[in-house]
Amino acid sequence: MKSTTKLLGKSRPDDASHVELDRTDKAILRALQKDASISNVALAAKVNLSAPACLRRVERLKSLGLIRGIVALLNAPALDAGMVVIIGVVLDRSTPESFAAFEKAAQNVSGCMECHVVTGEFDYFMMLRTRDSESFNRLHAEQLLYLPGVRQIRTFMVLKQVFSTTQIAI
């Protein structure tokens, strides 16, 4: 049975690899990744379509789940979330119940931006943002130590972000 992901109020298959994208669809996606606030008229001009045709294409890309949402990328340091911390987590048991309990709890960790199941010596990597080392120490003592089923946590403080992008190569 294929799993589904809820996006923009619609369900879509997780594997959208069957979707055929032409050159114009790809141009629309590239343009929206660079500036999602672009007006439909400006986007249409950029991809050589009429405004109504462009809007239909964008709506189609949304309904297919290829556009999951429109967001603002915020300045984390200006909002007291300038420190990035990567956390490696090892669970004490490798059971579906342990994984489910951890995953549910991880969603409630303050500042947690991402959580990934990984291969190798860790079961998960979490990426969180916080103000500074003092606020991270507080978060560690108040939340991370109480995550269910955790045997080991290893913390990696990011010293310098070399680059980060939200854009997928199309």
Question: Where do the language-model regions lie?
Answer:
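A compositional/biophysical signature of low hydrophobicity enriched in polar/charged and small residues
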Residues: M1-I170
